[in-house]
Amino acid sequence: MRIISWDVGVIYLAYCVLEYVLSKNKEVIINIIDWNIINLMENNRLVINCCGMKKGNTICDKKASYCLRTPDKKLFGYCKTHLTQYNINWSIQDTEKMFTKISKPDNTCTFLKKTGDFCGKKATYKYKNNKSTNYYCNVHYKSELKNRTKEFSPQPIKNTIVKKYPTAQLQYNLIKKLDKLSKHFAMLGIERVVIENQPSQKNPKMKSIASTLFDYFLIRGFCDKIHNIDIKLVRYMCPSNKLKVNKDNTLEVFKANKDSKKKYKLTKALGIQYTKQLLNNEQEQLDYLSLFEKKDDLCDAYLQGRYYLEFIMDKTDKNYPIIKCQENKFNKPNNDDLQNESGDDSETESSLSWENIKIEISDDQADYYAKKYNKSVMNKSNKLMMNKSMMNKSESNKKSNRKSNKRSNKNIITL
Protein backbone atom coordinates (compact mmCIF):
# COMPACT_ATOMS: atom_id res chain seq x y z
CA MET A 1 0.00 0.00 0.00
CA ARG A 2 1.15 3.54 -0.80
CA ILE A 3 0.27 6.77 0.98
CA ILE A 4 1.16 10.43 0.52
CA SER A 5 1.98 12.56 3.55
CA TRP A 6 1.74 16.37 3.42
CA ASP A 7 3.53 18.95 5.54
CA VAL A 8 1.53 22.18 5.18
CA GLY A 9 2.95 25.69 4.95
CA VAL A 10 1.85 29.03 3.54
CA ILE A 11 4.60 29.23 0.89
CA TYR A 12 6.21 25.77 0.90
CA LEU A 13 4.38 22.45 1.01
CA ALA A 14 6.30 19.19 1.27
CA TYR A 15 4.98 15.77 0.28
CA CYS A 16 6.36 12.28 0.76
CA VAL A 17 5.04 9.14 -0.96
CA LEU A 18 5.72 6.04 1.16
CA GLU A 19 5.22 2.36 0.40
CA TYR A 20 4.20 -0.07 3.15
CA VAL A 21 5.42 -3.65 2.53
CA LEU A 22 4.99 -6.66 4.82
CA SER A 23 7.71 -9.25 4.18
CA LYS A 24 7.38 -13.02 4.48
CA ASN A 25 8.92 -12.83 7.93
CA LYS A 26 6.15 -10.33 8.86
CA GLU A 27 8.66 -7.51 9.04
CA VAL A 28 7.43 -4.05 8.12
CA ILE A 29 9.41 -2.35 5.35
CA ILE A 30 8.74 1.33 4.54
CA ASN A 31 10.27 2.73 1.36
CA ILE A 32 10.33 6.28 0.01
CA ILE A 33 8.90 6.36 -3.52
CA ASP A 34 8.95 10.12 -4.07
CA TRP A 35 9.29 13.29 -2.02
CA ASN A 36 9.54 16.93 -3.04
CA ILE A 37 8.61 20.52 -2.16
CA ILE A 38 5.95 22.73 -3.78
CA ASN A 39 6.50 26.50 -3.85
CA LEU A 40 3.26 28.49 -4.12
CA MET A 41 4.97 31.87 -4.70
CA GLU A 42 8.01 30.99 -6.83
CA ASN A 43 7.04 33.20 -9.81
CA ASN A 44 6.55 36.43 -7.84
CA ARG A 45 10.11 37.29 -6.79
CA LEU A 46 12.78 38.36 -9.25
CA VAL A 47 15.70 35.92 -9.19
CA ILE A 48 18.95 37.35 -10.55
CA ASN A 49 22.64 36.94 -9.70
CA CYS A 50 25.18 39.62 -8.86
CA CYS A 51 27.27 40.80 -11.82
CA GLY A 52 29.82 42.63 -9.66
CA MET A 53 33.52 41.89 -10.02
CA LYS A 54 35.71 40.51 -7.23
CA LYS A 55 39.37 41.35 -6.61
CA GLY A 56 40.55 38.40 -8.68
CA ASN A 57 38.61 39.77 -11.69
CA THR A 58 35.92 37.12 -11.28
CA ILE A 59 32.16 37.59 -11.23
CA CYS A 60 30.51 37.46 -7.81
CA ASP A 61 27.47 35.43 -9.01
CA LYS A 62 25.75 35.56 -5.60
CA LYS A 63 22.02 35.98 -5.22
CA ALA A 64 21.36 39.65 -5.94
CA SER A 65 19.46 41.83 -3.49
CA TYR A 66 19.37 44.89 -5.82
CA CYS A 67 18.39 45.23 -9.46
CA LEU A 68 19.28 47.95 -12.00
CA ARG A 69 16.86 48.43 -14.90
CA THR A 70 18.28 50.53 -17.77
CA PRO A 71 16.18 52.46 -20.36
CA ASP A 72 16.73 49.68 -22.92
CA LYS A 73 15.12 47.26 -20.37
CA LYS A 74 18.32 45.41 -19.49
CA LEU A 75 18.61 43.99 -15.95
CA PHE A 76 21.74 43.98 -13.80
CA GLY A 77 21.84 42.38 -10.35
CA TYR A 78 24.04 43.43 -7.43
CA CYS A 79 24.61 42.22 -3.91
CA LYS A 80 25.22 44.61 -1.01
CA THR A 81 28.99 44.27 -1.35
CA HIS A 82 29.17 45.21 -5.04
CA LEU A 83 26.28 47.70 -5.12
CA THR A 84 28.65 50.63 -5.71
CA GLN A 85 29.73 49.13 -9.06
CA TYR A 86 26.40 49.90 -10.73
CA ASN A 87 27.89 53.10 -12.27
CA ILE A 88 29.76 50.89 -14.75
CA ASN A 89 26.49 49.92 -16.47
CA TRP A 90 24.48 53.10 -15.86
CA SER A 91 25.24 56.32 -14.00
CA ILE A 92 23.52 59.60 -13.15
CA GLN A 93 25.45 61.31 -15.96
CA ASP A 94 23.87 58.89 -18.44
CA THR A 95 20.43 59.93 -17.20
CA GLU A 96 21.28 63.64 -17.54
CA LYS A 97 22.38 63.06 -21.15
CA MET A 98 18.84 61.97 -22.00
CA PHE A 99 17.75 65.62 -21.46
CA THR A 100 19.00 68.16 -24.03
CA LYS A 101 18.54 71.94 -23.81
CA ILE A 102 16.56 73.61 -26.60
CA SER A 103 17.98 76.79 -28.11
CA LYS A 104 14.75 77.81 -29.88
CA PRO A 105 11.69 76.99 -27.74
CA ASP A 106 9.14 76.21 -30.44
CA ASN A 107 7.29 73.53 -28.39
CA THR A 108 5.31 73.71 -25.17
CA CYS A 109 5.78 71.72 -21.96
CA THR A 110 4.07 68.30 -22.12
CA PHE A 111 4.06 67.70 -18.37
CA LEU A 112 0.68 66.31 -17.33
CA LYS A 113 -0.82 67.93 -14.24
CA LYS A 114 -3.08 66.30 -11.67
CA THR A 115 -6.05 68.06 -13.22
CA GLY A 116 -5.42 66.21 -16.50
CA ASP A 117 -4.20 69.28 -18.41
CA PHE A 118 -0.75 69.90 -19.89
CA CYS A 119 1.53 72.59 -18.49
CA GLY A 120 1.53 74.63 -21.74
CA LYS A 121 4.57 76.77 -20.92
CA LYS A 122 7.46 77.20 -23.32
CA ALA A 123 9.69 74.11 -23.33
CA THR A 124 13.39 74.55 -22.60
CA TYR A 125 14.44 70.88 -22.39
CA LYS A 126 13.83 67.88 -24.61
CA TYR A 127 13.66 64.32 -23.24
CA LYS A 128 14.18 61.57 -25.79
CA ASN A 129 13.61 57.91 -25.03
CA ASN A 130 13.52 54.86 -27.27
CA LYS A 131 9.76 55.13 -27.73
CA SER A 132 8.74 58.76 -27.18
CA THR A 133 9.94 62.35 -27.05
CA ASN A 134 8.73 64.84 -24.43
CA TYR A 135 9.32 68.54 -23.78
CA TYR A 136 9.61 70.24 -20.39
CA CYS A 137 9.92 73.72 -18.98
CA ASN A 138 12.55 74.71 -16.38
CA VAL A 139 10.34 73.81 -13.41
CA HIS A 140 9.20 70.42 -14.63
CA TYR A 141 12.64 69.55 -16.01
CA LYS A 142 14.03 69.34 -12.47
CA SER A 143 11.21 67.11 -11.21
CA GLU A 144 11.44 64.80 -14.23
CA LEU A 145 15.22 64.53 -13.90
CA LYS A 146 14.78 63.51 -10.27
CA ASN A 147 12.18 60.87 -11.19
CA ARG A 148 14.26 59.41 -14.03
CA THR A 149 17.38 59.28 -11.85
CA LYS A 150 15.47 57.28 -9.26
CA GLU A 151 13.98 55.03 -11.95
CA PHE A 152 17.36 54.18 -13.50
CA SER A 153 19.15 53.45 -10.22
CA PRO A 154 19.40 50.09 -8.36
CA GLN A 155 16.18 49.16 -6.58
CA PRO A 156 15.97 46.62 -3.73
CA ILE A 157 14.44 43.27 -4.66
CA LYS A 158 11.65 42.90 -2.14
CA ASN A 159 10.19 39.63 -1.06
CA THR A 160 6.44 39.26 -1.29
CA ILE A 161 4.87 39.87 2.11
CA VAL A 162 2.94 36.72 2.97
CA LYS A 163 0.43 38.52 5.19
CA LYS A 164 -0.57 40.84 2.34
CA TYR A 165 -0.70 38.06 -0.24
CA PRO A 166 -4.34 37.02 -0.93
CA THR A 167 -5.35 33.65 0.48
CA ALA A 168 -7.49 32.94 -2.58
CA GLN A 169 -4.44 33.38 -4.83
CA LEU A 170 -2.46 30.89 -2.74
CA GLN A 171 -5.32 28.38 -2.97
CA TYR A 172 -5.52 28.90 -6.73
CA ASN A 173 -1.76 28.35 -7.10
CA LEU A 174 -2.02 25.16 -5.03
CA ILE A 175 -4.81 23.74 -7.20
CA LYS A 176 -2.83 24.48 -10.37
CA LYS A 177 0.26 22.77 -8.94
CA LEU A 178 -1.74 19.71 -7.88
CA ASP A 179 -3.40 19.44 -11.30
CA LYS A 180 0.05 19.19 -12.88
CA LEU A 181 1.10 16.50 -10.38
CA SER A 182 -2.18 14.54 -10.45
CA LYS A 183 -1.09 12.25 -13.29
CA HIS A 184 2.20 11.57 -11.50
CA PHE A 185 0.36 10.70 -8.27
CA ALA A 186 -2.01 8.41 -10.17
CA MET A 187 0.91 6.50 -11.71
CA LEU A 188 2.42 5.99 -8.25
CA GLY A 189 -0.77 4.26 -7.08
CA ILE A 190 -1.51 6.39 -4.01
CA GLU A 191 -4.41 5.08 -1.92
CA ARG A 192 -4.41 7.22 1.23
CA VAL A 193 -3.72 10.89 1.91
CA VAL A 194 -2.46 12.16 5.29
CA ILE A 195 -2.41 15.94 5.87
CA GLU A 196 -0.87 17.83 8.77
CA ASN A 197 -3.65 19.46 10.77
CA GLN A 198 -3.41 23.19 11.42
CA PRO A 199 -4.91 25.35 14.19
CA SER A 200 -7.61 27.61 12.81
CA GLN A 201 -7.17 30.53 15.22
CA LYS A 202 -3.37 30.91 15.28
CA ASN A 203 -2.84 30.89 11.51
CA PRO A 204 -6.08 30.92 9.48
CA LYS A 205 -4.18 31.31 6.19
CA MET A 206 -2.35 28.02 6.77
CA LYS A 207 -5.61 26.35 7.82
CA SER A 208 -7.15 27.44 4.51
CA ILE A 209 -4.27 25.82 2.61
CA ALA A 210 -4.73 22.55 4.53
CA SER A 211 -8.49 22.60 3.87
CA THR A 212 -7.91 23.21 0.15
CA LEU A 213 -5.51 20.26 0.08
CA PHE A 214 -8.08 18.06 1.83
CA ASP A 215 -10.90 19.13 -0.51
CA TYR A 216 -8.76 18.63 -3.62
CA PHE A 217 -8.03 14.96 -2.94
CA LEU A 218 -11.60 14.37 -1.81
CA ILE A 219 -13.02 15.82 -5.03
CA ARG A 220 -10.38 14.89 -7.61
CA GLY A 221 -9.18 11.64 -6.07
CA PHE A 222 -12.28 10.13 -4.50
CA CYS A 223 -15.22 11.57 -6.47
CA ASP A 224 -13.83 12.44 -9.92
CA LYS A 225 -11.03 9.82 -9.89
CA ILE A 226 -8.95 11.92 -12.27
CA HIS A 227 -6.37 9.88 -14.27
CA ASN A 228 -7.94 6.76 -12.67
CA ILE A 229 -6.49 7.60 -9.27
CA ASP A 230 -8.11 5.55 -6.49
CA ILE A 231 -8.04 7.49 -3.21
CA LYS A 232 -9.66 5.49 -0.41
CA LEU A 233 -8.94 7.72 2.59
CA VAL A 234 -8.24 11.40 3.23
CA ARG A 235 -7.56 12.46 6.81
CA TYR A 236 -5.80 14.97 9.06
CA MET A 237 -3.06 14.14 11.54
CA CYS A 238 -1.81 15.85 14.68
CA PRO A 239 1.54 17.62 14.00
CA SER A 240 3.08 16.47 17.29
CA ASN A 241 3.00 12.80 16.26
CA LYS A 242 5.86 13.09 13.77
CA LEU A 243 8.50 13.30 16.54
CA LYS A 244 7.19 10.13 18.21
CA VAL A 245 8.75 7.91 15.55
CA ASN A 246 12.09 7.93 17.34
CA LYS A 247 12.01 6.12 20.67
CA ASP A 248 14.24 8.68 22.41
CA ASN A 249 12.72 10.56 25.31
CA THR A 250 12.13 13.89 23.54
CA LEU A 251 9.22 15.01 25.73
CA GLU A 252 11.57 15.94 28.59
CA VAL A 253 13.56 18.14 26.22
CA PHE A 254 10.40 20.02 25.20
CA LYS A 255 9.25 20.45 28.80
CA ALA A 256 12.59 21.98 29.74
CA ASN A 257 12.24 24.66 27.04
CA LYS A 258 9.28 26.96 27.71
CA ASP A 259 10.19 29.48 25.01
CA SER A 260 7.99 28.90 21.94
CA LYS A 261 10.67 30.07 19.48
CA LYS A 262 13.25 27.69 20.94
CA LYS A 263 10.72 24.84 20.83
CA TYR A 264 10.03 25.53 17.16
CA LYS A 265 13.74 25.50 16.25
CA LEU A 266 14.25 22.38 18.34
CA THR A 267 11.36 20.64 16.59
CA LYS A 268 12.85 21.37 13.18
CA ALA A 269 16.33 20.25 14.25
CA LEU A 270 15.06 17.00 15.78
CA GLY A 271 12.99 16.26 12.67
CA ILE A 272 16.09 16.41 10.46
CA GLN A 273 18.12 14.38 12.94
CA TYR A 274 15.49 11.62 13.25
CA THR A 275 15.09 11.39 9.48
CA LYS A 276 18.83 10.94 8.96
CA GLN A 277 18.90 8.22 11.62
CA LEU A 278 15.99 6.34 10.04
CA LEU A 279 17.54 6.65 6.56
CA ASN A 280 21.02 5.68 7.70
CA ASN A 281 21.17 2.74 5.28
CA GLU A 282 19.70 4.64 2.31
CA GLN A 283 22.47 6.85 1.02
CA GLU A 284 20.62 7.83 -2.17
CA GLN A 285 17.77 9.38 -0.21
CA LEU A 286 20.20 11.21 2.08
CA ASP A 287 22.05 12.63 -0.94
CA TYR A 288 18.74 13.76 -2.42
CA LEU A 289 17.76 15.39 0.89
CA SER A 290 21.00 17.37 1.00
CA LEU A 291 20.05 19.16 -2.25
CA PHE A 292 17.23 21.09 -0.54
CA GLU A 293 17.64 24.23 1.54
CA LYS A 294 14.43 23.57 3.53
CA LYS A 295 15.18 20.06 4.70
CA ASP A 296 12.87 20.36 7.72
CA ASP A 297 9.69 20.37 5.61
CA LEU A 298 10.65 17.19 3.75
CA CYS A 299 11.66 15.50 7.00
CA ASP A 300 8.37 16.44 8.67
CA ALA A 301 6.38 14.95 5.79
CA TYR A 302 8.44 11.74 5.96
CA LEU A 303 8.16 11.33 9.75
CA GLN A 304 4.43 12.01 9.71
CA GLY A 305 3.82 9.38 7.03
CA ARG A 306 6.03 6.86 8.79
CA TYR A 307 4.25 7.36 12.11
CA TYR A 308 0.90 6.83 10.38
CA LEU A 309 2.02 3.57 8.77
CA GLU A 310 3.55 2.15 11.94
CA PHE A 311 1.14 3.27 14.66
CA ILE A 312 -2.16 4.58 13.26
CA MET A 313 -3.01 2.65 10.09
CA ASP A 314 -5.78 0.05 10.57
CA LYS A 315 -6.00 0.91 14.29
CA THR A 316 -7.78 4.25 14.44
CA ASP A 317 -8.89 4.59 10.82
CA LYS A 318 -12.24 3.09 11.81
CA ASN A 319 -13.15 6.59 12.96
CA TYR A 320 -12.55 7.90 9.43
CA PRO A 321 -14.90 5.86 7.21
CA ILE A 322 -15.29 6.63 3.54
CA ILE A 323 -18.94 7.38 2.77
CA LYS A 324 -20.13 5.50 -0.29
CA CYS A 325 -23.17 6.74 -2.16
CA GLN A 326 -25.77 4.01 -2.71
CA GLU A 327 -28.67 4.36 -5.09
CA ASN A 328 -32.17 4.06 -3.64
CA LYS A 329 -33.87 0.84 -4.70
CA PHE A 330 -37.49 1.27 -5.73
CA ASN A 331 -39.94 -1.47 -6.68
CA LYS A 332 -40.14 -1.76 -10.43
CA PRO A 333 -43.71 -1.91 -11.83
CA ASN A 334 -44.89 -5.10 -13.48
CA ASN A 335 -45.43 -5.36 -17.20
CA ASP A 336 -49.18 -5.72 -16.59
CA ASP A 337 -49.23 -2.35 -14.86
CA LEU A 338 -47.52 -0.72 -17.83
CA GLN A 339 -50.24 -1.80 -20.28
CA ASN A 340 -52.87 0.76 -21.17
CA GLU A 341 -56.53 0.13 -21.99
CA SER A 342 -55.78 -0.86 -25.60
CA GLY A 343 -53.38 -3.58 -24.43
CA ASP A 344 -50.26 -1.99 -25.95
CA ASP A 345 -47.13 -1.46 -23.86
CA SER A 346 -46.48 2.22 -23.19
CA GLU A 347 -43.79 4.02 -21.23
CA THR A 348 -45.11 5.65 -18.07
CA GLU A 349 -43.40 8.33 -16.03
CA SER A 350 -42.38 7.08 -12.61
CA SER A 351 -42.63 9.58 -9.76
CA LEU A 352 -40.66 9.26 -6.54
CA SER A 353 -42.64 9.66 -3.34
CA TRP A 354 -41.74 9.64 0.34
CA GLU A 355 -43.53 6.30 0.73
CA ASN A 356 -40.74 4.60 -1.25
CA ILE A 357 -38.00 5.86 1.06
CA LYS A 358 -37.40 4.02 4.31
CA ILE A 359 -35.19 5.30 7.09
CA GLU A 360 -34.02 2.69 9.56
CA ILE A 361 -32.90 3.78 13.05
CA SER A 362 -31.64 1.40 15.68
CA ASP A 363 -33.12 1.28 19.20
CA ASP A 364 -29.98 2.80 20.72
CA GLN A 365 -30.11 5.73 18.32
CA ALA A 366 -33.82 6.21 19.01
CA ASP A 367 -33.23 6.28 22.78
CA TYR A 368 -30.39 8.76 22.27
CA TYR A 369 -32.54 11.18 20.30
CA ALA A 370 -35.44 10.69 22.72
CA LYS A 371 -33.29 11.71 25.69
CA LYS A 372 -31.75 14.59 23.73
CA TYR A 373 -35.05 16.15 22.74
CA ASN A 374 -37.11 14.93 25.79
CA LYS A 375 -39.42 12.82 23.70
CA SER A 376 -40.58 9.26 24.37
CA VAL A 377 -40.05 6.58 21.78
CA MET A 378 -43.35 4.84 20.97
CA ASN A 379 -44.08 1.85 18.83
CA LYS A 380 -47.17 1.48 16.65
CA SER A 381 -49.32 -0.04 19.40
CA ASN A 382 -48.51 2.80 21.80
CA LYS A 383 -49.37 5.32 19.11
CA LEU A 384 -52.76 3.65 18.51
CA MET A 385 -53.51 3.58 22.23
CA MET A 386 -52.54 7.21 22.45
CA ASN A 387 -54.82 8.12 19.55
CA LYS A 388 -57.81 6.27 21.13
CA SER A 389 -57.31 7.96 24.49
CA MET A 390 -57.12 11.33 22.78
CA MET A 391 -60.39 10.59 20.92
CA ASN A 392 -62.14 9.59 24.16
CA LYS A 393 -60.91 12.74 25.89
CA SER A 394 -62.17 14.93 23.06
CA GLU A 395 -65.65 13.30 23.12
CA SER A 396 -65.92 13.67 26.90
CA ASN A 397 -64.89 17.31 26.61
CA LYS A 398 -67.64 17.93 24.05
CA LYS A 399 -70.32 16.37 26.32
CA SER A 400 -69.18 18.42 29.31
CA ASN A 401 -69.30 21.60 27.23
CA ARG A 402 -72.89 20.86 26.15
CA LYS A 403 -74.03 20.32 29.76
CA SER A 404 -72.39 23.54 30.88
CA ASN A 405 -74.11 25.45 28.07
CA LYS A 406 -77.56 24.10 29.12
CA ARG A 407 -76.94 25.10 32.73
CA SER A 408 -75.86 28.56 31.71
CA ASN A 409 -79.03 28.99 29.59
CA LYS A 410 -81.27 28.18 32.56
CA ASN A 411 -79.66 30.92 34.63
CA ILE A 412 -80.34 33.61 32.00
CA ILE A 413 -83.21 36.00 33.00
CA THR A 414 -85.14 37.54 30.14
CA LEU A 415 -86.66 41.00 30.62
UniProtKB/Swiss-Prot annotation:
* Disulfide-bond pairs as recorded: none
> Basic residues bias: where?
399-409
Chain segments carrying region Disordered: 329-351, 388-415
Identify the InterPro entries for this entry.
RNaseH-like_sf, RNaseH_sf
What protein name applies here?
Uncharacterized protein L451
* Acidic residues biased stretches: 338-348
GO terms for molecular function, please?
nucleic acid binding
Can you tell which superkingdom this protein's organism belongs to?
Answer: Viruses
